[in-house]
Amino acid sequence: MIAKLKGLVDSVAEDHAVIDVGGVGYLVFCPARVLTRLPSPGQAVALVVETQVREDHISLFGFLETAERDWFRLLSTVQGVGSKVALSVLSVLSAGQISQAIAAGDKAALGRAPGVGPKLAARIASELKDKAVALGGMPAPPPRGAGTDAAGEGPPGGPTGDVLGDAVSALVNLGYGRSEAVGAASRAAGLGATTVQGVIGLALRDLGRGGA
């Protein structure tokens, strides 16, 4: 099984690249986000590779980051998601954005990928939610009032569910996607923000830098 290719970019097409490794050209299917980041032909490149062996052919799928390869594998485990759809998702969302979208249940973000309809987006979000959190996605904020004690106070040192929920709602109203709003608000809370204004302020700064 081929797990990595290190060589020279020979050519780049719409859905694949040919990598020259010691005079042998390997055709590697890649997400569009990867293809646009490859160096010019003749330049060195290293790709993390997933090898799929079928009865009549062997296919190589290449990625610049291990996290991209890991998400390709996970997406491919969902019924209705083949290699083509998995590449489609990774073409419109980075590995981090996929984690955030699934952890937040943001089916609209997943549905931006060609071939992913509402039902398939819901299935992906449902089946991979736990894995998304494990891979760095931030879970959606708890429902309003959740996680508070009898006095209505949140856990020491952190914002209440009401605060996170209100901050996320405000960010969404400003035009940000729910998944990126959840991620930015959660990171703001991790930096010590405990009020709606504090969370929004840090989150907007985070979003202005393009997120984590």
Curated annotation (Swiss-Prot):
It is found in: Cytoplasm. This is Holliday junction branch migration complex subunit RuvA. Gene3D superfamilies: 5' to 3' exonuclease, C-terminal subdomain, DNA helicase RuvA subunit, C-terminal domain, Nucleic acid-binding proteins. Residues 65-143 are annotated as: Domain II. It comes from the Bacteria. Residues 159-212 are annotated as: Domain III. It holds the Pfam family HHH_5. One of its GO terms (molecular function) is four-way junction helicase activity. The RuvA-RuvB-RuvC complex processes Holliday junction (HJ) DNA during genetic recombination and DNA repair, while the RuvA-RuvB complex plays an important role in the rescue of blocked DNA replication forks via replication fork reversal (RFR). RuvA specifically binds to HJ cruciform DNA, conferring on it an open structure. The RuvB hexamer acts as an ATP-dependent pump, pulling dsDNA into and through the RuvAB complex. HJ branch migration allows RuvC to scan DNA until it finds its consensus sequence, where it cleaves and resolves the cruciform DNA. Keywords: Cytoplasm, DNA damage, DNA recombination, DNA repair, DNA-binding. The gene is ruvA. Homotetramer. Forms an RuvA(8)-RuvB(12)-Holliday junction (HJ) complex. HJ DNA is sandwiched between 2 RuvA tetramers; dsDNA enters through RuvA and exits via RuvB. An RuvB hexamer assembles on each DNA strand where it exits the tetramer. Each RuvB hexamer is contacted by two RuvA subunits (via domain III) on 2 adjacent RuvB subunits; this complex drives branch migration. In the full resolvosome a probable DNA-RuvA(4)-RuvB(12)-RuvC(2) complex forms which resolves the HJ. Has three domains with a flexible linker between the domains II and III and assumes an 'L' shape. Domain III is highly mobile and contacts RuvB. It comes from Rhodospirillum rubrum (strain ATCC 11170 / ATH 1.1.1 / DSM 467 / LMG 4362 / NCIMB 8255 / S1). Residues 144-158 are annotated as: Flexible linker. Residues 136-161 are annotated as: Disordered. Belongs to the RuvA family. One of its GO terms (biological process) is DNA recombination. Residues 1-64 are annotated as: Domain I.
